[in-house]
């Protein structure tokens, strides 16, 4: 029998539903790794839209309805949180830190991996490494390798994960990457575009609350602000934060730079002041970042050479909603403009909205800070003193 012409062979493969393996040059393009030097690109909140696994632990893949991942950069560490929702609305979460030793390193090691199920946290013993691959701005491709097997995980940034047609169109590219990495394509997980997550509702409900303030509109955050409600997690200053009495923030915007001053008064009337300058981060992330700051306590100034990321959310004219991730932990901070911060009934009525925003952002609501409406600040009183009338 003579050789089958190439075009006939391709037609036969198409009829049989068989795909030709990706060419080496195509694999080279798809598998370009993200190094430590460029790891800022993985920061953010991500929704798993496609995955395939070669693993003995099938329970991790079976009955999965959604998986939501948060990557927070803290200096040389990537804080990793993965929340998996299964059929029946049961949740399993994983927590770890990722690290790489050199700027050119392409693999990140998992440290202190923990698993949480039904409120019980326990160590999850798996010596794993992670590799990220270059992809589109709102996409994340990640390969996990550990004792339990290998996983290829394809994500879309939270907020751009619901267009089912776009996700379907991208599946062919995901499958090519899997084949390039040597995965067996059997029954991939495919997100349906609508399922909720463990810690929050899908963005139909949260979209209104989490609209970010962009660089173009940053002037709206300028002013003097009083903290009226806040929640934190993974805080390195949790003891001090529990003793917080008031927090007063001054923000001034000049040529795209936010000059930030925070004055915190503790319950023993001692004060801590933090100052830094923030600039806009990557356009697609709508964040503002700083790389250093100064902390003053009892007249002693300490220079902090640490990274922090801030995101502001659209809200009312005299309101400020701010999410902070960095050296001090992860905080949601709700402010009222100085002068409209004292109406306790109004503040109480707004607490439900603050809690909804916290849940949308993945915070556990435990013991929030709530301003009492009257306590003074480090540098001034909460209310101007009323002078007695002259006879």
UniProtKB/Swiss-Prot annotation:
According to its UniProt entry, one GO biological process term is: response to toxic substance
The protein's location, in the record's own words, is: Secreted
Q: In its keyword annotation, does this UniProt entry include Nuclease?
A: no
Tell me where the sequence repeats sit in this chain: 24-202, 203-391
Q: Which UniProt keywords apply?
A: Glycoprotein, Repeat, Secreted, Signal
Q: Which domain of life is it from?
A: Eukaryota
Post-translation: what modifications? Glycosylated.
Does the entry feature the keyword Repeat, yes or no?
A: yes
Q: What is its main location?
A: secreted
Give the matching InterPro entries. Calycin (IPR012674)
Provide a GO CC annotation, any one: cytoplasm
Enumerate the GO terms in the molecular function aspect: toxin transmembrane transporter activity
Residues with glycosylation annotation: 54, 63, 97, 234, 268, 277, 307
Leader sequence range is 1-20
Describe the subunit structure. Answer: Homodimer or heterodimer of PSTBP1 and PSTBP2.
Q: Which PANTHER family match?
A: ALPHA-1-ACID GLYCOPROTEIN (PTHR11967), ALPHA-1-ACID GLYCOPROTEIN 1 (PTHR11967:SF2)
What this chain does, per the entry, is described as:
Binds both saxitoxin and tetradotoxin. May play a role in toxin accumulation and/or excretion.
Designated name of the protein: Saxitoxin and tetrodotoxin-binding protein 1
Source species: Takifugu pardalis
């Amino acid at each position: 029998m003579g050789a089958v012409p190439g075009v006939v062979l391709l037609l036969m493969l198409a009829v049989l539903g068989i795909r030709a393996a990706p060419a080496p040059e195509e694999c080279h393009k798809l598998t370009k790794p993200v190094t430590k030097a460029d790891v800022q690109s993985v920061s953010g909140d991500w929704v798993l839209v496609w995955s395939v696994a070669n693993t003995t632990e099938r329970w991790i893949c079976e009955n999965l309805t959604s998986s939501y991942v948060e990557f927070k950069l803290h200096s040389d560490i990537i804080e990793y949180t993965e929340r998996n929702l299964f059929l029946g609305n049961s949740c399993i979460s994983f927590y770890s830190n990722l690290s790489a030793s050199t700027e050119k390193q392409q693999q990140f090691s998992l440290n202190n991996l923990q698993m949480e199920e039904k409120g019980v946290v326990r160590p999850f013993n798996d010596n794993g490494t992670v590799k990220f691959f270059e992809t589109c701005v709102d996409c994340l491709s990640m390969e996990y390798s550990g004792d339990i097997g290998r996983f290829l995980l394809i994500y879309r940034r939270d907020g751009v994960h619901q267009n089912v047609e776009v996700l379907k169109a991208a599946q062919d590219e995901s499958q090519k990457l899997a084949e390039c990495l040597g995965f067996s394509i059997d029954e991939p997980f495919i997100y349906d575009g609508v399922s909720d997550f463990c810690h929050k509702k899908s963005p139909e409900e949260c979209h209104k609350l989490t609209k970010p303030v962009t660089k173009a509109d940053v002037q709206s955050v300028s002013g003097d602000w009083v903290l009226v409600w806040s929640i934190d997690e993974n805080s390195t200053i949790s003891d001090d934060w529990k003793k917080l009495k008031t927090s007063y923030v001054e923000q001034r915007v000049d040529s795209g730079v936010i000059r930030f001053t925070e004055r915190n008064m503790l319950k023993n009337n001692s004060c801590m002041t933090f100052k830094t300058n923030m600039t806009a981060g990557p356009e697609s992330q709508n964040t503002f970042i700083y790389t250093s700051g100064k902390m003053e306590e009892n007249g002693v100034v300490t220079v902090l050479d640490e990274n922090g990321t801030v995101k502001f959310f659209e809200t009312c004219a005299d309101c400020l909603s701010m999410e902070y991730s960095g050296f001090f932990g992860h905080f949601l901070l709700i402010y009222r403009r100085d002068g409209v911060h004292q109406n306790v009934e109004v503040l109480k009525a707004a607490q439900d909205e603050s809690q909804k925003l916290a849940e949308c952002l993945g915070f556990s609501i435990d013991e929030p800070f709530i301003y009492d409406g009257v306590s003074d600040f480090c540098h001034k009183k909460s209310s101007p003193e009323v002078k007695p009338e002259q006879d």
